[in-house]
C-alpha cells in the first residue's frame, strides 16, 4: 500500500516564479528568514536608539529643571521656548553618568554607538562635556507632564535608559 502525489513547488525568487526542488526551496526559505530577522533587528535597534535619545533629553530636563521651567514660563510661545532650549548648552552630571558606562569586559562603550541615525554631530554630548538638545528632545520636553518631574520619575527614566541601552 503506497500512495504518491505530485507537488507543484513553485516559489517567487527575485520576483520571478520558479519551479524548485526541495533543496532549493529550503535554501530560498532560509535566505528569506535571514532577511526578515535582519530587517526586524535593524528596525528594533533604530527604535531603541531613538528612545534612548529622548530619554537623554528628559534626563537633561530633570537635571536642570529650574532653568527649563524658567525658560518655558518666560517664552511667549512654544516654538520660542523650543528654540531657546535647543540653542543653550546644558550641563548634566546625570547624563554624563548614563553615557559613560563600561562593558562587561571592562572596555568603555562609545556613545556614538547609541546615537540615532541621521542625528547631526552638534547635538548630544559635546567634547566640552555640555549637552545640546535636538529638535525631538526639545519637543518631548515641552510635551512632558509636570508629574514626571518628581524624584521617583527620574529613577524610572534612568532605569528605562539602562534597559534600552542593554537592548542596543
Residue ranges, per PLM feature:
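C-terminal interaction appendages of subunits in large macromolecular complexes
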Residues: 1-168
Amino acid at each position: 500500500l503506497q500512495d504518491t502525489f505530485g507537488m507543484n513547488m513553485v516559489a517567487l525568487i527575485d520576483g520571478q516564479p520558479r519551479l524548485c526542488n526541495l533543496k532549493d526551496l529550503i535554501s530560498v526559505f532560509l535566505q528569506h528568514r535571514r532577511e526578515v530577522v535582519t530587517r526586524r533587528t535593524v528596525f528594533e535597534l533604530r527604535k531603541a536608539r531613538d528612545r534612548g535619545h529622548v530619554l537623554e533629553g528628559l534626563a537633561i530636563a530633570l537635571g536642570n529643571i529650574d532653568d527649563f521651567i524658567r525658560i518655558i514660563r518666560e517664552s511667549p510661545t512654544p516654538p520660542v521656548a523650543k528654540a531657546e532650549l535647543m540653542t543653550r548648552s546644558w550641563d548634566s552630571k546625570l547624563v554624563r553618568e548614563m553615557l559613560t558606562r563600561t562593558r562587561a569586559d571592562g572596555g568603555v562603550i562609545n556613545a556614538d554607538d547609541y546615537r540615532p541615525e541621521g542625528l547631526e554631530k552638534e547635538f548630544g554630548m559635546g567634547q566640552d562635556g555640555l549637552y545640546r538638545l535636538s529638535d525631538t528632545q526639545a519637543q518631548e520636553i515641552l510635551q512632558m507632564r509636570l508629574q514626571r518631574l518628581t524624584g521617583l520619575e527620574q529613577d524610572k527614566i534612568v532605569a528605562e535608559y539602562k534597559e534600552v541601552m542593554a537592548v542596543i
